[in-house]
Amino acid sequence: MMRTPGLLGLRGFVAFAAKLWSFVLYLLRRQFRTIIQYQTVRYDVLPLSPASRNRLSQVKRKVLVLDLDETLIHSHHDGVLRPTVRPGTPPDFILKVVIDKHPVRFFVHKRPHVDFFLEVVSQWYELVVFTASMEIYGSAVADKLDNNKGVLRRRFYRQHCTLELGSYIKDLSVVHSDLSSVVILDNSPGAYRSHPDNAIPIKSWFSDPSDTALLNLLPMLDALRFTADVRSVLSRNLHQHRLW
């Protein structure tokens, strides 16, 4: 069967149009990802009503305990690039520390909106860093996140954890004796095994530039500071392990 030049030309045009449309869609997706990554975000901290101020004066100021790795940041060191980090993705900062007499560089990526998150929650809570990492590394990361603002002064490290069955457990009683006022934000359920009713789970973060988990938590943290006992709320929300 002979194919007419007109039919061949039409098929060629259709094939070209399909390729062109695929390229346009690629450019649109790339631009959309850029818009998401660099969008301006806000969470308005409005003046409290007289009733809210009165309520807040009747309860203790709460303590928010913050994990570092995969909660606020993600890092990898020299020679190790995890598949979760896209090759060529620039780190937010580089740390140079000495571990066992060997210099090691850590390439640290900040979770989206972490600076804004810390700025807001530091107005509501006393912030405490509690990481299972070594102090020489955890302290350097906390210094960068604090950025001389003085909101991450209290810090606890691996030596303050308890090692059980190969996992580091964080004892919140070393942070504050009154656990009714303590909240921990951590991506690892094993870390707060001893205090599940004080925990807000958060999904682990590695590289997704469109992640909004920290922003999603702000309304809850805003409301939680008004409670007399945080456990009365958090004990009802174990299903949150899949939400954030």
Swiss-Prot record:
GO MF assignments: phosphoprotein phosphatase activity; protein serine/threonine phosphatase activity
Mutagenesis / variant outcome for changing D69E: Strongly reduces phosphatase activity
InterPro entries (UniProt xref): Dullard_phosphatase, FCP1_dom, HAD-like_sf, HAD_sf, TIM50
Catalysed reaction equations from the record: O-phospho-L-seryl-[protein] + H2O = L-seryl-[protein] + phosphate; O-phospho-L-threonyl-[protein] + H2O = L-threonyl-[protein] + phosphate
Protein name: CTD nuclear envelope phosphatase 1
BP GO terms, sorted: cell differentiation; midbrain development; neural precursor cell proliferation; nuclear envelope organization; positive regulation of triglyceride biosynthetic process
GO CC annotations on file: cytoplasm; endoplasmic reticulum membrane; Nem1-Spo7 phosphatase complex; nuclear envelope; nuclear membrane; perinuclear region of cytoplasm
Localization, UniProt: Membrane; Cytoplasm, Perinuclear region
Subunit-level organization: Interacts with bmpr1a, bmpr1b and bmpr2.
Residue stretches spanning the membrane: 7-29
Gene: ctdnep1
Record lineage: Eukaryota, Metazoa, Chordata, Craniata, Vertebrata
Resulting phenotype, D67E: Strongly reduces phosphatase activity
Membrane topology: Single-pass membrane protein
Domain FCP1 homology: 58-225
UniProt family annotation: Belongs to the dullard family.
EC numbers for this chain: 3.1.3.16
UniProtKB keywords: Cytoplasm, Developmental protein, Differentiation, Hydrolase, Membrane, Neurogenesis, Protein phosphatase, Transmembrane, Transmembrane helix
Primary location class: membrane
Function of the molecule: Serine/threonine protein phosphatase that may dephosphorylate and activate lipins. Lipins are phosphatidate phosphatases that catalyze the conversion of phosphatidic acid to diacylglycerol and control the metabolism of fatty acids at different levels. May indirectly modulate the lipid composition of nuclear and/or endoplasmic reticulum membranes and be required for proper nuclear membrane morphology and/or dynamics. May also indirectly regulate the production of lipid droplets and triacylglycerol. Induces neuronal differentiation by antagonizing BMP signaling.
